[in-house]
């Protein structure tokens, strides 16, 4: 639903009949979903008169995305209830969180999100604001992903069916083992005529059996689907010839050199985990039934700004974070801001492990096999700002746990939060969840 700039029929959404029903049965689902999806601190629905909203935002007219004056961590997004091209009411809400202002400059993403929410709040309105708990749950997630992942608008119902199918595959096994698989949803399959293996008989996602799904691993090979979820064959991605193994990893995963706009990838990554991504690195992942939006540029920029490291180092760190997550390895990576022996010793116990005469380096591909093994071992790996490993394993000193440090559910999270008093600590759980700690802040990736 495109944003309509005109005076709404109702000046305050709260004056609509039964809107309180949404506040009671749909508001929590709506706010919780957006908070988790965008990794935000808070979502607030701005229930006020239109003139009050304009005064608060210091604007003469309402736009889809607006800055909140005097707040460095808030923006206001406006969806709308529109029926038969008649604007009934604006639905404004505030997004609060770190770096949320970035969406003011890349507003196409938030615009598409706002459009998807407009569709859902209008549906809720047409049902007398009943059913908000399911309208703004998993259904909203699938509509938003379908809306935001591509410049082309896809059929939300067919896309939701594709997601449901991939979720089923993510929880199934072939010959007793979980297996990855994937598809490229494409507007024109002739764009992939090189390295394309055509079926004798066209398939549909509902007629493909498990043995056939096993043929495309979602890494090198992908089913090509049209907008009706039909497939005529499998595409084999091109082989990159580059010595930059970190860059190769990201280019391979997002098919940077193969995927054509407005096409996108849907794949299973591991047990109960799916991913929807484009060639730019925009990605929606569902891990443990929670949808999250992420972009590798955002998290690498965060590390660069917090630690003063190079982007090359930040991408190498992210490389190992993602390897642990996708291989379901529980681990902690710690990058101290102050890498002095005194600073590290102050937060760790005496049983620090240093194995080699020369330091391992996360930027060196030949060291990868050893680093992978170390990450799967007990304790936290300590990485310097230059990418060299300072200690293969350390343990957070819980005896000095101050009252200001919140006790967390898992000892690994507690350790990561303690270590993050100096720099950044990343906790990867066995279920694939990634949590990044910096000071008192926790960010999901």
Protein language model features and the residues they cover:
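Divalent-cation
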Residues: 2-445
């Amino acid at each position: 639903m495109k944003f309509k700039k005109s005076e709404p029929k109702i000046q305050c959404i709260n004056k609509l009949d039964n809107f309180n029903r949404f506040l009671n049965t749909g508001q929590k689902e709506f706010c919780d979903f957006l908070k988790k999806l965008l990794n935000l601190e808070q979502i607030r629905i701005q229930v006020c008169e239109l003139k009050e909203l304009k005064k608060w935002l210091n604007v003469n007219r309402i736009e889809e995305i607006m800055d909140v004056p005097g707040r460095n961590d808030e923006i206001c997004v406006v969806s709308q209830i529109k029926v038969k091209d008649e604007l009934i009411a604006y639905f404004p809400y505030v997004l609060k969180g770190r770096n949320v202002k970035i969406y003011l400059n890349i507003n196409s993403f938030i615009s598409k999100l706002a459009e998807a929410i407009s569709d859902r709040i209008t549906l809720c309105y047409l049902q007398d604001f009943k059913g908000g708990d399911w309208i703004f749950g998993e259904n909203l997630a699938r509509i938003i992903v379908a809306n935001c992942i591509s410049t082309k608008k896809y059929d939300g119902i067919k896309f939701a069916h594709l997601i449901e199918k991939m979720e089923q595959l993510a929880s199934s096994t072939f010959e007793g083992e979980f297996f990855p698989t994937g598809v490229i949803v494409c507007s024109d399959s002739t764009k992939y005529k090189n390295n394309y293996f055509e079926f004798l008989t066209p398939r549909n996602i509902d007629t493909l059996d498990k043995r056939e799904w096993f043929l495309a691993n979602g890494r090198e090979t992908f089913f090509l689907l049209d907008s009706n979820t039909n497939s005529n064959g499998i595409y084999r991605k091109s082989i990159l010839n580059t010595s930059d193994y970190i860059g190769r990893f990201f280019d391979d995963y997002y098919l940077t050199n193969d995927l054509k706009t407005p096409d996108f990838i849907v794949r299973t990554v591991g047990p109960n985990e799916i991913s929807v991504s484009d060639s730019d690195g925009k990605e929606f992942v569902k891990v443990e039934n929670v949808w999250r939006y992420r972009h590798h540029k955002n998290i690498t920029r965060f590390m660069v700004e917090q630690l003063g490291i190079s982007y090359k180092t930040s991408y190498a760190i992210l490389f190992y974070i993602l390897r642990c997550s996708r291989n379901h390895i529980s681990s902690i990576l710690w990058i101290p801001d102050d890498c002095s022996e005194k600073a590290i010793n102050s937060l760790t116990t005496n049983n620090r492990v240093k194995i080699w005469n020369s330091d391992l380096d996360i930027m060196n591909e030949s060291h990868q096999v050893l680093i992978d093994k170390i990450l799967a071992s007990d304790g936290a790996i300590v990485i310097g700002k230059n990418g060299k490993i300072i200690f293969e394993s350390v343990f957070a000193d819980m005896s000095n746990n101050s009252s200001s440090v919140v006790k967390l559910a898992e000892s690994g999270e507690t350790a990561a939060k303690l270590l993050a008093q100096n720099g950044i600590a990343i906790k990867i759980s066995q279920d694939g969840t990634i949590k990044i700690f910096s000071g008192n802040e926790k960010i999901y990736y």
